[in-house]
Amino acid sequence: YNVNYLPIVSSGRAFRALWKSAYSKVSELLAAVVYEDPWLAGGHNGLSNAEDPLKPEDPYPRVKALRETMREGGIPDTTPIIMAGGVWYLRDWNDWIDNPELGTIAFQYGTRPLLTQESPIPQQWKERLMTIEEGDVLLHRFSPTGFYSSAVRNPFLRSLEARSERQIAFSTKEAGDHIFQLDVGVKGKNFWVTKGDLLRAREWFGAGFTVDNL
């Protein structure tokens, strides 16, 4: 339909794969490429299995690598890369603007517009966003999609965190360190766990947690 497209990627490697498989066939319709920082952007993020969710990487080398990949495909530097994730003040990005290594750069705000008078979200939520401190945002994998997602820690998310911490590995037969039979909450079933996990499971069960909410 001759509609311009703006792919969202989190690495030069991801763009290369998409470019070779599809985008190169309609290169004239490529309006821009959005680089979504997999550690700083909100919502679902494109963190790969090779990347550590607890060790954020500097976005500059990653965006530079993305531009180099675009150049390999013959895409001119006038095609913008849109930096998304962690953008609040443009003054924080002065060394990115008019930088020949990066080519044309634009910036995408996500959180700031939510705080405007025109924003339809509840005032209570706006006030909450204004009081967020370090550690209040969690990069988690609780989404049913299986992808990492970044969200503000609310009571529901905290309950999922606590539940996730009460997970133990088990075996359906004795193997390795899994030689202690789980004896709480699994009536009629045989599971073997490590001694440490058995003690933890007993403690959780004694605190009122069941197999369904351990």
Model-derived features: where do they sit?
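Generic beta-sheet signal
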Residues: 8, 36, 84, 109-110
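Glycine-rich beta-to-alpha transition loops that act as phosphate-gripper elements at the mouths
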Residues: 7-15, 77-92
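Conserved active-site-proximal phosphate/metal-binding subdomains
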Residues: 30, 38-59, 69-78, 90-214
